[in-house]
Amino acid sequence: MQNLTDKGAIIFGVQKTSQFANGETATADWVDYHSPFNPRGDGYQDPATSSAGAGSSIASYEWLDLAAGSDTGGSIRGPAAVQGIFGNRPSHGLISLDNAMPLSPKLDTPGFLARDPYLWNAANAALYRENPLSRWSWGDSQPSSILSRNKTLFMNWFNENILPRSSDPLTCSSGLLLHVDGSAGFISRNGYINPPVPPFGFSNGQISVFAETPDSVFPLGQVPAFSSITNHTEYLPVTINVVAAKGCDVLIAKLAEDMVAAGILKVLKIGAGIEGGEILMRRYFVRDDGDEVMSRITSRGRLLFQDWDRLRGILAPTLYVDYTKIGKGKWEAMSADDFMAMVSNDDFLGDLCVKTQHLIGATSWERVSESKVVGHHQLRAAHQVYTSPDLKTVKLRGHSHATNEHYYVKSDGVWKFAGLKPEVRWNEHKFEEVFKGSYTQSEKHS
């Protein structure tokens, strides 16, 4: 870290890692504290493990340029692959791990995750400091008895027969080995896995671990996939891993720069896809310097605040709406356009100063016909009203305990939301003052 700060890096903070930097899956294994969210796709994909917070933050925050992590058996490459960003496992022993808590000293390596390969290369250069080739030239001059004690049979075989160093210092590596790590498959965070079994087999991701070679993740693009979480087509990243000969780390980073310059790779963006796009939920907060920053963090069961297009897409042509219990009217057949205009208005859910969270309790379903279903839900709707859209100062709170009927109809073969009827049981604090247009002044104070 001192090397980075010497080059002008500003350390922003620390990030979540899995317990003991071990291999864990979201929800199933993250027990003591919550796993970070992967912002890509439907926002409900596993962020991978160990350096999960580093990968999630780089894919989520535009103001964050670089994240440091460690890779023992894939702890940088895994988060990089599933979140479609650049990440590297350096040649083992190239970078000092003095004062770092070890997991496996013979396998541990530090590395970076980044969206911009130019910045990634500059950070790697700061970490390496000296030319890696000069380090290995020095190592090659040492007695073979010392080297043999630090190599395994696989390492010798691979580095001598599969991917040896080139005699040309400009090319460094005799070749490159490519393997696929991120293949755009859904790995949802709400799945529970089988009990652990003895390890079996050997994956391509383990080559660099045992051969001590550099292995880096290159995001190639993204592909569409239908999500069972959002019921929409989302986009998942596709990545490839590039392995070079031991000590040829700079070659890989320069290759990424050249591929961006040639238009083959891209500088990546934050969001639901590697080319951008809104994440399922947004939070506003203010840094110490007073600049407003929008962090986009995914959250289960929550649509993007003000993602009105997504809401419009699930509405039936007409809706039954009974808002009499929250100070509005009742409509037997409100058009979808009128419903959108009402809920998105500044005096209702479109108010940027209002934040709300709906917690659903017991639920039952009533099948009225082949084309109509009614959902009956217990509900606690919590609201906070702020003095301004920067959401710094709370003005008032108002919470409602209710049951809610939701209506669904099949329209042209597709199930659509067709209305609602909340039945308020009791309120907490100043619920009547949450929405500006819901109650008249006389009703608020009656």
UniProtKB/Swiss-Prot annotation:
Q: What domain of life does the UniProt record list for this protein's source?
A: Eukaryota
Keyword set, alphabetical order:
Lyase
Residues that coordinate or bind substrate: Y323, N404
User: Looking at the keywords, is Lyase present?
Assistant: yes
Q: Name one Pfam family in it.
A: Scytalone_dh
Which InterPro entries would you find in this protein's record? Amidase_dom (IPR023631), AS_sf (IPR036928), NTF2-like_dom_sf (IPR032710), Scytalone_dh (IPR049884)
Q: Which residues form the active site?
A: H358, H383
What Enzyme Commission number does this protein have?
Answer: 4.2.1.-
Q: Which GO terms describe its molecular function?
A: lyase activity
How is the quaternary structure described? Homotrimer. Each subunit contains an active site, located in the central part of the hydrophobic core of the monomer, which functions independently.
Per the record, the similarity remark reads: Belongs to the scytalone dehydratase family.
Q: What does this protein do?
A: Scytalone dehydratase-like protein; part of the Pks2 gene cluster that mediates the formation of infectious structures (appressoria), enabling these fungi to kill insects faster. The product of the Pks2 gene cluster is different from the one of Pks1 and has still not been identified.
- Report what the protein is called: Scytalone dehydratase-like protein Arp1
Q: Which organism is it from?
A: Metarhizium acridum (strain CQMa 102)
Gene encoding this polypeptide? Answer: Arp1
